[in-house]
Amino acid sequence: MMFAVATMAATTVCRVRKITDPDMSAVRVADLRTERMTDPMSIDTPVPRLGWRILSAKNDVVQTSYHIIVASTREKALNGEGDLWDCEVGSDQSQWITYGGKELRSDTRCYWRVKINTTQGESDWSDVAMWNVGLLSESDWRGQWIGLDHAMPWEVEDVHSRLGARYLRSEFDTEGEIKRATLYISGLGLYEAYINGQRVGDRVLAPPPTDYRRTVIYDAYDVTGLIAGDNAVAVAVGNGRYYTMQQNKKPYKITNFGYPKLRLNLVIEYADGKKKTVSTDGKWKLSADGAIRSDNEYDGEIYDARKEFDGWTMPGYDDSRWQTAERVAIPYGTLRGNMSPGMTVLKEIEPKSVTPISVSDARQSVVVDLGQNIAGWLKVKIPDVEAGDTVRIRYAEKINDDGSLWRDNLRHAYSTDYYIADGTEQGRWWQPAFTYHGFRYAEISILPADATKEKTPDSHLSTLNSQLYRLCRQRRDGAHGYVRVRRHRAQQDIPQRHVGRAGQLQGHAGRLSAAR
């Protein structure tokens, strides 16, 4: 088995000006950002703020003026046609410059460049950057909130609620040449979206959590390259912090905001200027009886491969046995674009050691030591096991003297992922979709489907040891170290704890304020 452990304003002059291509200067402009993000897709304001970095091999370089152009197409920006905004300012300001051009509407792409003068000479024009204005008004959303406002008979709602993922899908066709396509999506609490079998974007655990009574976040993606003639859009929706895991334990402290739900607009613009919008409505199909049987950040994820929907993200899938999605309760919070970079996988790291260990209920087990505390999960390569066999992954920050996991600090949190085999794995890769863990150590065990059946204890142990590979670690927006791996739009403690008595936010406030 393989486990992948993976700035002041002066006189302002605005006029049309032709871009020239001077020789490369020692001064360069780079790292163009809109609201401190690179090429963001869900800008939630018609007047965003722009900024850039000044690079030079010389000393004493001070900006004296800047020239910004903003265009409606990349070609116009490259040709120097700032049809949305063309502005030259005598100023040393290079951050938080408010857009002052034509009024921007929802679902508008903007392409921009900047050139500066400095005490050490003039820069060349920067590369073209972009931003996309999101859906600024509720009236811009055609999609309804859909899902199920109840649990299924096999699901458990108690101190350790067990609610599985909701799988939703719809098919549509397109006609004519597509100029661009943009997906606007909010899946509460978490989502993974697919178009024609391809995963949309590289974000994980999206969207970031909020106080859903005040704000609900949506993401936007450029999906132009994913759209064909016959199409399917499919979304798996997890619980996240919307449907909470311990709601019946301390309801006065742990707010439950409702059942998982989805809202989506897919805006397709054709080359002739016409638009088509695919949105969530009463025609979508839904199933709650899929492979993800349970998911939350405290307890982990339970995945049963025997319940997989083979091909459900592709057009032509037979969903006749699925039920029709219901129109569900609307969240109280205002729907706003995600004005943060989003969480992605930072890197995959090698474990420091892998040690066999005896665990009473397991056929075989190893303990993985990463050598450092991280926030993330294990990605595992499942060996040739029998249907019903379970790979269990338990997480901890410390170990006992005998090498077993020390998990007393987790209290009521299980912090455990399960993969239940269908018997046809033969080296398939798997990782949880809707949970993550704070840990240094992980105990990986194979649990037999029938505990009384005779097994060969060492049949997979050498494979466990020799093929242990890497670990997925998540990226955090913020400073390095602790801060970087503890951010999910807002600062968080490790996911399995639910108290903040140590003053983590106060202790790291200085580093947060200095983070790029």
Feature names for model-found ranges:
Residues V16, D21-R109, R113-A515:
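Extracellular/oxidizing-compartment recognition motifs
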Residues M1-I19:
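Bacterial Sec-dependent N-terminal signal peptides
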